[in-house]
Amino acid sequence: MPQYLETFLAMSKKVLVEYSRYPIAFVALFVQIFLIIVLFVITSFAFETPGTGQAQTTRFAAMMAYGFVTNIILSFTLWEIGFSIREEQVRGTLESLYLSPTNKFSNLLSRVFAILLWTAAISIGGLLLVSGLVGGLPVNNLGKALFVLLMTTTGFLGFGFIFAGITIRLKETAQILVNGVQFFFMIFSAQVFPFSVLPLAVQDYVSRWLPVSYCVDLFRTTLIGEAPELLPNDVLVEYAIVIAFGIVSPIIGYFYYNWIDRKARTEGTLGEY
């Protein structure tokens, strides 16, 4: 078996064993996500225009729910790849791990493998919950939507690699940056509401310049079965942006992480608390 595959399997098993030791935390996270989703749905009902038809209510709920799936993946990727490096530093195991002949790419990927399984379960459960609250969610073009979600996830891996490098440099302070990035994309990439809610200036000068915005837009409008909000007349352009993001982002992120890793080894700061 190739060494990189052995590393990936061993580290994935380690992460799964860690999660299995904290079942209460696992259940608590499920409950937390469900409560957040219910809060968003109820809030959307509160601001609903009187006389709005069921179709419009379902559309808005679908926009929120499908967008929130991308938010969950982004959040878990940042924390599990990015900030979990910090956890290894605190435990005192990062330096010995990275001085061993393990494949660094497999090590980083293993951190997100288990959490993606977890994320999939949470996402499916959350979507079923919203579907029950609003009387069903539209599910169209499932194959295309899953492809877009795959490209979105690989693009987020690049963010995770970058934040893993930043965490080595900033250590505990990186928490603030991770939280800031989460809320930045939640707002400006409209992950929990339609882009039409944002002021036109924000859409033109911020949202349209973020690849994440096109990932969110294309994923949820594909499932809903309507034209994208950002580029309604250029769907192929949105696909090109999403595919480019999914391919280029992890490459850039991994090279950045390797650069920070080598620099930290040279300076002797890799295992510093």
How would you describe each model-predicted region?
Residues M1-P138, L142-A164, I168-Y273:
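Hydrophobic transmembrane alpha-helices and immediately adjacent juxtamembrane helices
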